[in-house]
């Protein structure tokens, strides 16, 4: 989401700034997301549910290739969200930085459900001079992120699989995830039918879509530096 800092004369922009840090953080976040997808890919396709064969990508290049679309999906959603804020700032003549992506260490080093990133932020340097501009800038990010997330979620659900509840419970590790807004209709339309005593095992891309819907909804809360705040 956007981070407001500083002030300037409306209609003027800061001089061009170096984007080296933006590029470095982008590469690190893309890499960490691919690695997270590499782990997810192994868990989804393993014969023993949720089993990770190796944490070394060189030992499982096919799984690393499976992690690539995961990383692309994560970056696409984050980029859509932040560019929604950025382009709306430019529309109103307000100076803003390019997105700063926030990478996370590999999941085997820092156990987490986050898909290789803590998100991204832009820095708004200009003064927001009207409530209309403030509202439009705030809402543009979540809308753009949602638009990017829905096709990814739909495809991921179409590739998800159904297993027995017993298989899930005996796998040694499982999480029952909640259903953010739009998950229900998307799951019914794109996902496989889940019968009694069965559960849905999400494809890695379905998890990306699920996570995007959850974070977008949380971002709209009227709290602090969140988009709704």
Show the residue positions of the predicted features.
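Hydrophobic transmembrane alpha-helices and their immediate loop junctions
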Residues: 1-229
